[in-house]
Structure formats: structure tokens, C-alpha cells
């Protein structure tokens, strides 16, 4: 082991009770895969935490997607893995549009997030609409870079996006 860090529990406090909770015994809130470009490594957790470290184990930045964009609206837990590509960090938040288990808000948007991997700051956010219903809106897939586009599967569709803006190029 070259280094070890405690990035946090991955859980978040229960509403009003001050205790951590887990919604599902099948999910640990640390189901997403870390991603690296050989210079840094980024971990994402089901509670919305994103944490980046350099290759020596020094924390570079930390942020929480739920704090920045509102409570997730997932049946189980958020577990999409981030993608590092061409000097940018991409993360899909493809969620349902109605509260579930008391979490989320009506008409919660699904979106793609592009961040600076060195700082964690948002470069762009692009809403991704779908006509799917309830749990069919949820996806935990990883964004795939392919031929100058970002491929995103979920919400009953496959879409191609411009990596510079997030704008949708095509939909199938």
C-alpha cells in the first residue's frame, strides 16, 4: 500500500435524527469505481461526495453534488462512476423526477456535469431530458468518450453529447 486515506463514510446524516443511515443492504454508498488519469484519482460516493487525491495521497479537493444541486432522487443509491477524458471530469446524474423514500423533489432534473479535475469546479451542467417514467429514468452508467462525443445511456435512450458544452448531438 502506497497510501491510504479516509475519504468519509459515504453515508449522510438521516434527516432530523443526526444518525447515518443506509437505505439498502445491497448498496454501500461506495459502489462507484474511482477514476484516474495517472496524475490524480477521483472517488465518488452515493451521498454525492466527490474527493480527488494526487498520486501521493494528498487531498486536492472535495465537494458534494447534493449540496450543490439538491437531494438525489434514486430508488436505491447513486453509484455512477465519473469519467476522466481530455482534461475534464464528467459525471452523469440520471435520476427520477419524483421523490422516492422521502428523498428528492418533484421534477428533479437529470443532468450531465463537467468539472475541472484539478479543482472540482463546474465547467458546465447540461440537463438531459427523457420521456421515461419513474425508475426507468435512473441510470448508473459511466459516460463513454467515443469519436469526439460523450455517449450516455439511461432514461430509455442513448445520447451523444459535445464534450465542450454538453449539448446533445443525437438521440437514439
What positions do the PLM features span?
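Noncatalytic, solvent-exposed loop/strand surfaces
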Residues: 1-172
Amino acid at each position: 500500500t502506497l497510501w491510504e486515506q479516509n475519504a468519509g463514510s459515504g453515508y449522510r446524516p438521516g434527516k432530523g435524527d443526526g444518525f447515518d443511515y443506509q437505505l439498502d443492504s445491497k448498496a454501500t454508498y461506495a459502489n462507484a469505481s474511482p477514476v484516474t488519469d495517472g496524475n490524480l484519482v477521483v472517488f465518488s460516493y452515493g451521498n454525492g461526495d466527490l474527493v480527488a487525491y494526487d498520486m501521493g495521497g494528498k487531498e486536492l479537493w472535495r465537494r458534494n453534488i447534493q449540496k450543490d444541486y439538491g437531494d438525489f432522487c434514486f430508488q436505491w443509491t447513486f453509484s455512477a462512476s465519473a469519467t476522466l477524458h481530455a482534461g475534464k471530469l464528467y459525471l452523469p446524474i440520471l435520476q427520477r423526477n419524483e421523490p422516492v423514500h422521502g428523498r428528492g423533489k418533484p421534477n428533479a432534473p437529470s443532468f450531465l456535469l463537467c468539472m475541472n479535475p484539478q479543482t472540482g469546479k463546474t465547467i458546465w451542467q447540461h440537463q438531459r431530458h427523457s420521456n421515461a417514467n419513474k425508475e426507468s429514468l435512473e441510470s448508473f452508467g459511466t459516460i463513454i468518450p467515443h469519436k469526439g462525443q460523450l455517449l450516455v445511456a439511461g432514461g430509455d435512450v442513448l445520447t451523444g453529447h459535445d464534450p465542450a458544452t454538453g449539448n446533445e448531438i443525437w438521440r437514439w
